[in-house]
From Swiss-Prot:
The gene is ohgt. Residues 541-650 form the CULT domain. Substrate recognition component of a DCX (DDB1-CUL4-X-box) E3 protein ligase complex that mediates the ubiquitination and subsequent proteasomal degradation of target proteins. Has an essential role in mediating growth by negatively regulating insulin signaling. It also has a role in maintaining presynaptic function in the neuromuscular junction synapses of third-instar larvae. GO terms for cellular component: nucleus. Residues 156-177 have a biased composition (Polar residues). This is Protein cereblon.
Amino acid sequence: MDDEETAEIDETSSSSTNTNTNATAMATATETAAEMHVELEQDEEIPQGSENGAGTGAGDGTRAEAGASAIHAETTAHVSSRARLENMIEEVDNMFEEVSELMVDVTELMRRANQLREDAGTGAVPQNPTVATNTTPPAEIEEEEEGPEQQAEQALVNNDSPSQASISSRHSGSDMSLDSPGSEDDSDAEAVPRWMIPANRVRSAVDMLVSQARNRDGGIATLLRRENFLQRVRSMVFSQDRIRGRASDDANNADVINTVPDDTSEASPPPPLDVDMEEGVRFDTNLPAEHSYFGTNLNRVPGVDYLEVGSTHRMLIFMHQHILFPGEVLPFMIDGNIIDEEIEDTGRDGVIFGVGFPLMQPPDDNPHKLYGVTCQIYEKGESGRQHVFYKSRALQRIVINCDDIQGPPQYIARNPTMKCYSKVKILPEYFLPEPLKCIDMGSLNRFRDIPSMQEKFRRFQLTTTPWPVEACGEYSFEHIVEKARQKLEIHKIDTMPKCPIQLSFWLVRNLHLTEKMMRLTFLTDSVNIRLQIIGTTLKHESLFYCRYCNSSLAYCSDLFAMSKHGVQTQYCNSAGYIHETNTVYRVIAHAIGYSGEPSTEFSWFPGYQWHIIICKFCAQHVGWEFKAVEPNLAPKVFFGLAGSSVRIGKTSERTPTHGSRFVVRNLLRLVSRELE
């Protein structure tokens, strides 16, 4: 047992001795008060006897005057004794209140002394039978299998940096609050009584419990369902105090603190896997693009031409929970009468309808706008359940005036049964070619395509133009395309389009921008500006985070293409719900759990079975695991992350506990309420 724990136990014994002394004083005061009551009654009897004696000896004047003087003296003494007695009774009441408060302090001190004894393995301190204490022992924490010493020491190192902490309302006078930074030093420990656990210690203990729960089956949900959660937090506090004390002694003997790595810095992603190294037949990426899970009886539908830029058209519209970019394929299942009636009404072979995105925030100057895309149906097939499978492709960006919508807008993924029409306007796509490529150099043009001469040819072109180098470089996008190609090489994608307009939309889908950047690129009419926005994101490393609890799930560097359309594709399940799916080789260790049983029915990838995966931290659905059921099929296992359940974020957002700060803060609020 260390010195600090011994001092606390001595303090406990001292407090118990003070309690006994105060109780003895209280008993003495009570006896004194009783004696004063007896004296007061005797004093009250003496005046009555004097009055009776004066009545019988009325002839003796001297005795009457003496009796009157005695009565006056006794009355004065009686008043003085009564005042003194009332003061003593008031002092006894105050002593009772002080003793009651001291009993509460002794209860907490005895509880902590018992916990210190149990942690030290020397048994419990004998308790006073008159003191009510909590006899429930703290629940044991399963630390051995996860390496408690290493985890606790690592948590202490991580928590040395400022972080948000929580504290109960009784600590409102301290610097530690729900939204203020905390520290792991002992500067704030003296601001509260010694029996009270400082807020920074509670924060550190909850962080460790969350980290341990993350590495076990059930995740945070199991942690909250377990009994004696508050006792587990207290036990973790004392365990970390012991480890912190040993670490401090080691630091004083040898300067080894600087050699501990800082896990809060941005961690580099692991090297990407190479699926070509796996033995077996490489999966045909053309199969998912065909959406063969709809069946083989799909018929081609004649297409229509692109609509003129700036023109306005009245068409059937639906809503969609994801943002589609031109070139993406949208499979869906709907009542066939809606589309068939549309073909009969328009008298055209092909069908074009609009898809709006409520996720897109309208500009401040016109909040009644809704952005979306036009989609063309190119294949359909019967499902046998009064629904028809359709495959459509997004063509052009549109803007919808909400005041012109006729009918209730319905989501295309929820089996709409009613029609909704509106006027839509086709948005333009402006593209300015590179200025130097517009210069005709005559016979020197033959050197343009020679790699060894391109740089010299470019410098020669710059000398013939009135524009500065910065102006020419502002509209150049070749270096952006080259950087994007190098970054996408690890994803095994070789279907990069050459048209700049299509290329800009294709890069947005395959480079995985944040939602804010996706909105910005969609609202941009200039292809050049769109490519420049994409270029600013090429140097960032990103992760997939759970949208519900912000837990890190997978690195974007592990993305790969299981479809010829790229790493992100829209798929439709048997219920008609459309999922935006991102395929990755692997997920972060201890990041997911499983729900239900695996199945091969309606599999998006022929030859693979799917199994629902959930976030291990919050138990929410985040995607599927696909495992090969056919022999010699590569990759053997991969994962599909649902776009509606994950978000893209920078690697610097990843926390040491692999979870979000608000989860820990909610646990701290729970602990604070229990401590109160």
